[in-house]
Amino acid sequence: MKIKKFLDEANLKIISELTKNGRIKLTELAKKLNVTPAAAKERVERLIKKKIISISALINPEEIYPLSACIGIEADADGTNIIIRKLRNCPLVFHLAKTSGNHSLIINMVAKDISQIEDFLNKQIRSEPGIKHVEVNLSNSIIVPKYLPLRFFPSIDPEYVACGLRVDDEERCPDCPSVKR
């Protein structure tokens, strides 16, 4: 595979260093790799271009949202696809994955309180056809990773929230962070 060959010792070291400190200076990174800053920059840019890494701000969710939930959903194929389409851009969701086993879909989300999780479950999941079973596990502490790629972006269109629902739609989550305040 080309990707495996591309991830040589130097590229793995770059990934390791950027994981520890995404703001490391190229001169410092170059010293750790024993290469020139230009060579380090070229390698970082190639890793980004090949979509192996992405450099962005991560957020400590506990500073904003004290609760998190892991939601397991058992649904038919249509129900699973509906939920994926609805939640793909939800700012509260930080992990969404199709699975095999007891659940067809796993959702990890953050919330400010239990009522926000209940609203989310009732409006975004339980209301959809094809949902057979929903299992929720609550957490008040995310241990690893401590920082997450939460998406606090306002919707591009002021009439719609990030998930595609209208701002005035009764089905949207009342505390959606994508609504401009």
Pin down the residues of each PLM region.
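A compositional/biophysical signature of low hydrophobicity enriched in polar/charged and small residues
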Residues: M1-R181
